[in-house]
Regions:
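A SIS-like phosphosugar-recognition module
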Residues: 1-148
Length: 148
């Protein structure tokens, strides 16, 4: 239910030091593989090439995704208790309720990405006006930064 999702979000404590990281790795349960692309798109929209957002299931993670380590990468386990990947102090694990479905995972993941955004410069807001000017020329139609 929406109220249960909201309660889960409210009790999720995100670290206050996310601004020191320039890479984030979200591990989602295999059964929610279809939400990965949504999170990757949100990272691309908000941070472009400045902050790396990687999103994989635990099964995908097992296939050499973490060979190259970085002290500036933060790992987020959604419904996966990560005790292996990244430094211990660079991890957040969020337990999902047994009844969690795609809506719960989508809402929680977007909330956490929003918390990451709060602690970094507002790249999207600072660039959206110039972007819409460029794309308006490309599409030969006026595209506004704010959807009305």
């Amino acid at each position: 239910s929406p109220q249960k999702i909201l309660n889960l979000i409210k009790k999720t404590k995100t670290p206050k030091n996310l601004k020191k990281f320039n890479a984030f790795y979200i591990i989602v349960p295999t059964e929610f593989d279809n939400v990965r692309e949504l999170f990757q798109t949100k990272f691309d929209e908000l941070f472009g090439p400045i902050i790396n957002g990687r999103v994989f299931t635990i099964e995908q993670t097992k296939h050499a995704k973490t060979v190259v380590p970085s002290d500036k990468e933060f790992f987020i386990g959604l419904g996966y208790n990560n005790k292996l990947f990244g430094k211990k102090q660079n991890r957040l694990n969020v337990t999902l309720p047994k009844s969690a479905g795609p809506a719960t995972v989508m809402a929680l993941g977007h909330y956490i990405i929003g918390q990451i955004q709060k602690q970094h410069p507002n790249y999207f807001k600072n660039n959206i006006t110039n972007y819409t000017k460029q794309t308006s020329k490309m599409f030969k139609s006026t595209i506004k930064p704010i959807v009305e």
